[in-house]
Amino acid sequence: MADAEKNAVAEKNAVAEENAVAEENAVADKNATKEVLAEAASVLEPVGLPEEAELPAKIMEEFMRNSRKKDKLLCSQLQVVNFLQTFLAQEDNTDQNPDALASEDTSRQKATETKEQWKELKATYMDHVDVIKCALSEALPQVKEAHRKYTELQKAFEQLEAKKRVLEEKLQLAQKQWVLQQKRLQNLTKISAEVKRRRKRALEKLDGSHQELETLKQQAGQEQEKLQRNQSYLQLLCSLQNKLVISESKADDKDVKGPALPPKSP
């Protein structure tokens, strides 16, 4: 009976040590997985705006599928740990109850099965970790390429923004020049209207001056005709006056000489 108890205690200690080692390995694997995921997260972290740094749909889908697998593995490990805790609790109860030592073989069989399940789960977990690492190793170059293209697109976008600002400045300058040209055109239109108005007034005055000139020409012609008639009349008067003077001088000469002698008869 004492040997059975010693064997049970030794088996219990061995199971506890194996569980401790398994837990340490699980923690180490979990930490390694966290490091891999942290590295992936640092690479997958968006550089600019979230909508501008979205990963391709296939990469995100693969990453989410691997995350679900990891969660399932963690749940399975928790179930195994729970089973081990339950088993250890039952072993504690067995130590306190001597009647339960008869089930030592059954306990060993369960412990062996638990070890096998743990090994299988660990192997499956490591396989999935390797799959995740491979998927990440395949995804990282694509992510880097996406980041490179994003950087190129960002530079191109900045260049386009710079060109846009230059074009906007040119557009504003052109609009200001257009406004100035419109003001100048309005001023020229006003000046042209004023020049046309003054020209029209000058033409009207010129037409009036032409009419006055024609009237003056007609009046001058009439005055010229009057002058010619007056000159003709004066000439006629002068000629008549000269004739009268000559006649009077002849009469005076006759009076001075006396009566004229009668002509001699033959």
From Swiss-Prot:
Q: Which UniProt keywords apply?
A: Cell cycle, Cell division, Centromere, Chromosome, Coiled coil, Kinetochore, Mitosis, Nucleus, Phosphoprotein
GO annotation, biological process: cell division; establishment of localization in cell; homologous chromosome orientation in meiotic metaphase I; mitotic sister chromatid segregation; mitotic spindle assembly checkpoint signaling; regulation of meiosis I spindle assembly checkpoint
Q: Where is this region: Disordered?
A: 95-115
A single cellular component GO annotation: dendrite
Tissue specificity, per the record, is: Expressed abundantly in brain and at lower levels in testis and kidney.
User: Where does this one sit in the cell?
Assistant: Nucleus; Chromosome, Centromere, Kinetochore
Q: How does it assemble?
A: Component of the KNL1 complex composed of KNL1 and ZWINT. Part of the ten-subunit outer kinetochore KMN network that includes the KNL1, MIS12 and NDC80 complexes; a bioriented kinetochore contains approximately 150 copies of the network. Interacts with the MIS12 complex subunits MIS12 DSN1, and PMF1. Interacts with the NDC80 complex subunit NDC80 during mitosis. Interacts with ZW10. Interacts with CETN3.
Membrane-crossing segments per the record = none
The protein's name: Outer kinetochore KNL1 complex subunit ZWINT
Provide the function of this protein: Acts as a component of the outer kinetochore KNL1 complex that serves as a docking point for spindle assembly checkpoint components and mediates microtubule-kinetochore interactions. Kinetochores, consisting of a centromere-associated inner segment and a microtubule-contacting outer segment, play a crucial role in chromosome segregation by mediating the physical connection between centromeric DNA and spindle microtubules.
Against InterPro entries, the record matches this protein to: Zwint-1
State the Gene3D superfamilies in the record.
Answer: 1.20.5.4090
**Annotated positions of the Phosphoserine modification:** S232, S265
Q: From start to end residue, where is composition biased (Basic and acidic residues)? A: 105-115
Name where it mostly resides. Answer: nucleus
List, alphabetically, the Pfam families matched.
Zwint
Coiled-coil ranges per the record?
A: 136-237
